[in-house]
Amino acid sequence: MKLLDVCASLSLMTLAACAGTAASEQSLPCELKPAAASSSLRLAARGVQIYECRTAPDPYSPAQWTLVAPEAELFDVGGQRVGRHFAGPHWEATDGSRIVGSVKARADAPQRGAIPWLLLGTKSVGGPGHFSGVTQVLRINTVGGVAPATACSPGVPGGRVSVPYSADYVLFTD
């Protein structure tokens, strides 16, 4: 058995054993473990994933729902709103600090009907503050947010749909 298969199997067993609880860094799929960083902040996100009906690149394929952007509010462990998450993807704190991310790794969510878990590399694009030193973001514990299973027709008015989702974002610094 390959190492990746072993890591995935162990992670899934750990997740199954901890069903109903938040994932810990120890239960992550191997490909999502942040490299040499320490967790600085854990945020809960509640919002929507916005999809738009677009023509497929192949003219013989049907139109498809394509992710446009997330729109979510970010909350600390005490339930206080501390920022927002939006297109880019960006995370912006209420103090004005902001980061933009790019996907480094992804893994299917253990829960059916949930958007994937992600590891993103980030860079600061705002002023100094809570998010300015963040170098990686981990998206875990996702619920919902998946594109509609129904077909779409490009050019039809209302060709966008907002799908509710929630997730935990763990922010890391070097």
Regions found by a protein language model. Give the residues of each.
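Bacterial N-terminal signal peptides that target proteins for export
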Residues: 1-8
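Primary mode marks residue(s) on the alpha4-beta5-alpha5 output face of response regulator receiver
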Residues: 24-51, 57-174
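Polar low-complexity intrinsically disordered regions
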Residues: 1, 21-23
